[in-house]
Each structure stands twice: as C-alpha cells, then as structure tokens.
C-alpha cells in the first residue's frame, strides 16, 4: 500500500494521538469560556471563543492535532434550516417532511459558515506548526437523519420509514446535503485545515442496501469532490457502528484514514491497517476509571497496532464527566510507549 505520509505532521516514528471532543465540557477552562454564551450555536460562530477552546487541549496536552470547535449541525443551520440546542436535551430541529420543506431548504441560505472559516484561519495562525488542524462535517446520512427526526438520539424509525416510503425525495435531500457538505469541506481546506473528517454517527442503524445508498455513495462523492481541489489532503471517515459493513466501506470508499468505534475487534483494526490508516478505538468509558485500567486497555491497542498504520484515538468522543488528569495520563502513557517502541510506520 502506498503510505500516506504523516497525516498529523509527525516527522518521526511516533504514534499520532488526538481525541474526538478533546475541546469540551470535561475541561474547566472550556466551561469558563462556554458559560459566557448562552446559545450553543452562537458559541460555535464566535470566532474568538471558538478559537480559544479549539486551542485549549493543545496547550494542556500537546496533542498532534487540533479539531476545530464546531458542530455537524452548523451546515443545515447555515442553509436556513431551524436548528436549536436545548440544555440537557440536545438539538431540536424543524422536522423535514415534504417537497415544500425541500424547496424551503434550497432558498434560505445564510452566511453563517463564513464564521467557521474565519475560526479555522485564526486557529491556524496560533497553532504550533507541528500540529495539524482538522476540519470536519457531518456525513449526509447523519445530518439528514437529524432533520428527518427533528431531534437527536432516537430509534430512527421516522428516518428509515421516510427513506423507504419517499425514495425520490429522500434521494433529492441526500444529494443536496452531499453537495453542500463537499463545498463546506473544500472551504475548510481553503481556509487552512490540514486534515478533514466526516462524522457519520448514525450509519450503524442502516441495513446493507441502505448503507450503500446513504453512507457509501455520498461519502465517495464528497471525497472525490474534495480531492479535485485538494488531492493530497488526508480525509478521515467515521461510519460509526458499521460493524461488518466497515469492510465494505473500506473496499468501496477511497478514504485515507478510517476511524472505528470501540466495538471493532483489535485484530480487525490490524488487518485493515494494511489497506488504510486506522484511527481508534479506546472506549471513552475507560477514561472514567483508574490509571491501571487505562494503562491495561491502551496497552492492548498499542501492542496490537504496533508498527501499523495507526492513529491513537477513542471509539467516540470524550465524555463530559471525564477527569482531565486521566486524559493527561493516557496521553503521557502513549508517548512513553512510543519512546520505548519507536518502530511505528509513522
């Protein structure tokens, strides 16, 4: 396999490390900044505050990558769709139901995404040159499912029923979001993002046929579109919960880096790393435990992936109740391991 050299700017034989939701509620310095802005989306669009919280975990832990502080739902919001975040509830959206809703979606864009690009530029100015900056977007199926459900975590009966019963409209919506997502990622790359990531949080609710149509196909289109303008930019895809369909995803989608959740067996990660860089997959709950358990679980991952195409991360985002000192311990442990075993492919 042709090596993707240094996707996270490590110019040595070391294991890149960063964490999903590394900028977030588990950090006291984040809470201090966040409490000054009541509305979450306003916070995401605040250039100075979003820049500050993006940089906080880099200053505290020295991760190999910063991920821009934003949200996957800024895209539909910027397209004029009604999106709000309720405390202790999560996202609440206008529910997409009809062709009239599609016409509305096509005709009410705003310039909110320009703030995201300003944040990327500002972070890039302040970020150490050895640290990568990751831009991201929600994958079309996940964004679409939020719009169809009108809220966050559900059983997805509404979304799945809609795509079964309204195939033409569902495909129109999917294609529209796919196009806008590709544009959003291209603009993030133009603004200075070194790496791009697609989060497909709800891909695991689909069967194989729908997974192909609503996850694989739009992801391929987005990657090919981005690569037209930025052929060398590494792209991470995270089809969370794909289980056995991860293998189909790897085979059919031209990704550089595959992020996997904690349900994926380590031996599968090792096998896949011969075809693609693999990122993952420590269970975030492990960081709620103690140092011995953290060390034990991290060691198993590191030993299995030793010498492979690998980025150390979690299987999902850092939980809000995570002790910051546990994140510090894990990061230092990975660094110590790599010092003793400096024969990684990176």
Swiss-Prot record:
InterPro entries: UROD/MetE-like_sf (IPR038071), Uroporphyrinogen_deCO2ase_HemE (IPR006361), Uroporphyrinogen_deCOase (IPR000257). Substrate binds at residues 21-25, 40, 71, 146, 201, 316. Keywords: Cytoplasm, Decarboxylase, Lyase, Porphyrin biosynthesis. It is found in: Cytoplasm. Catalyzes the decarboxylation of four acetate groups of uroporphyrinogen-III to yield coproporphyrinogen-III. HAMAP family: URO_D. This is Uroporphyrinogen decarboxylase. It comes from Rickettsia felis (strain ATCC VR-1525 / URRWXCal2). The gene is hemE.
